[in-house]
A protein has these predicted regions:
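C-terminal all-alpha effector/ligand-binding and dimerization domain
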Residues: 1-112
């Protein structure tokens, strides 16, 4: 993904092959991976977890992100499950000099 004239992040998704047979990669150029999987394969993510870790990019990642070796990055790994079955691993390398993470947390009020 890019913003203006520079790349921001590298996104890679690993899908459970037996769950997503005959995947059509060209369709992904036009929209969201998750929207495509939901409509084409009736995917329903029931839970997901995410891990954020600081990192330095490897040679290939530095070339794609157009950054020197000393620029820190953030590795975001998301693990998506469908009824306790791991179906998607999403790996994102985000350049640390042009991107901020923002999180918001909400309390779910339980009704009695």
């Amino acid at each position: 993904r890019s913003a203006e004239t520079f790349p921001l992040m590298i996104e890679t998704s690993y899908l459970l092959q037996s769950r997503f047979i005959a995947l059509e990669p060209d369709v992904l150029r036009e929209g969201s991976l998750y929207a495509y999987l939901e409509s084409r394969y009736n995917m329903e993510i029931t839970d997901a977890g995410e891990v954020l870790s600081p990192m330095l990019a490897n040679t290939k990642e530095r070339l794609l992100l157009q950054i020197p070796a000393h620029i820190p990055c953030m590795l975001c790994e998301r693990f998506c499950h469908e009824r306790e079955q791991l179906i998607v691993i999403h790996r994102t390398v985000v350049r640390g000099d042009k991107f901020k993470f923002k999180a918001a947390y909400y309390v779910d009020e339980k009704t009695e």
